Amino acid sequence: MSVDVLWAGWRMGYIKKASAKGRVLGPCLFCAKARLKPGKRNLVVARTPRVLAMLNLYPYNVGHMMIATRRHTPSLADLTRDEALEVTEWLGRVEAALTREYEPHGFNIGINLGRVAGAGVLGHLHWHVVPRWDGDTNFMPVTANTKVLPESLDRTYERVVGALAAVDRRFGTRARR
């Protein structure tokens, strides 16, 4: 059985910088974003008292989102029951919205705990939701260290906000947008 390799050429430089400093690069990204009103400039799509939903500034694919707890905590074991339930609900909500808007063939949904596991933002739990399509990889990241995205982050933001509004009825709540 052969093994496929997923390679993000820009990632190693980022990890080495963080590793050399032995800490997160600057203040906690998610704590800073959690204090901001949702908006296109900061990529925050929605927030609740417990959860933050935002686009990834360095997406692996169009629609790549992150769901984070608003409370700074490094471990799944530290989550309250309410936080764990709301994060799970938001993962489902984002999956439904991205499916409605982009019709992907699948998703990578996951979390990296700790620097050695690939976490770029240490100490603050966050989940990645990455839509996937058949044939969504090509030679550009390998040969040119470049990821090709079919639309701008601004356009992705608009589409995701609209799709989340459309699925809100199903989930019975509305986040601040």
Identify the meaning behind each predicted range.
Residues 1-177:
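HIT superfamily nucleotide-processing domains
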